[in-house]
Amino acid sequence: MNETEATLPVFTLEQVAEHHSPDDCWMAIHGKVYDLTPYVPNHPGPAGMMLVWCGQESTEAWETKSYGEPHSSLAARLLQRYLIGTLEEIT
């Protein structure tokens, strides 16, 4: 975790789960929480592909795009724009 991330709010998976619609879409990916609501209408793939992961731990979807292909480095840079916090570690 870098210095900037250390100052971000920490969310539980239950809090992420409250944001599960096209108008309120949060995802947890690799221990970080992203509010992807503004990006939903701009997603280049089918909207439904992204929406099924709203409100969830979505690392698997990020890594495979649901069909075995990783996201591009451009997508990884774009994702950082939507970072809002970190996911609480479960011990």
UniProtKB/Swiss-Prot annotation:
A Gene Ontology molecular function term of the record: heme binding
Residues at which heme binds: H43, H71
Disulfide bridges in this chain: C25-C54
Stored Pfam families: Cyt-b5
SUPFAM superfamilies found in the cross-reference section: Cytochrome b5-like heme/steroid binding domain
InterPro entries the record matches: Cyt_B5-like_heme/steroid-bd (IPR001199), Cyt_B5-like_heme/steroid_sf (IPR036400), Cytochrome_b5 (IPR050668)
Gene Ontology cellular-component annotations: intracellular membrane-bounded organelle; membrane
Keywords on record: Disulfide bond, Electron transport, Heme, Iron, Metal-binding, Transport
Domain Cytochrome b5 heme-binding per the UniProt entry, residue ranges: 8-88
Family membership: Belongs to the cytochrome b5 family.
Name of the protein described by the UniProt record: Soluble cytochrome b558
Species in which this protein is naturally found: Ectothiorhodospira shaposhnikovii (Ectothiorhodospira vacuolata)
Source species taxonomy: Bacteria, Pseudomonadati, Pseudomonadota, Gammaproteobacteria, Chromatiales
